[in-house]
Amino acid sequence: MKAKAKTNEKLLKEMIATPGADKIGEYSLTDSRHSRITKFMAETLFDENMGGRFGNSHIALGMSYRDTYAGDVSKLTDAEAKRLGFNDSSVHTDVVSTTDRTVTAHLKDGTEKVIYKDGKFVL
């Protein structure tokens, strides 16, 4: 994995050198209509769900939390978690962006469908 940063690049590279931290652990789009949080709070658990004008997207490097599993998490084996794509790492660092974006799905039949635009899901 290659990584660059305008500031603290050394810290970023040290972080992703940790086992599993060079992989995506979480990705999210927040619809601006579903969050009452409209400004950064300097608390990641709030900031990763900020709505704002364009909603937000956030990506976490490192650990995938198993409590997001749709089934009975107590029965989720390590092998099954790995097969499903859960990542294991001592790192889970969220990177949040509130810039305007359009997200387009590329479908099996070769067509494309816009699913998120102007901070809102459009399905």
Task: Describe the predicted segments one by one.
Residues M1-L123:
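Metal/cofactor-centered catalytic core regions of large enzymes
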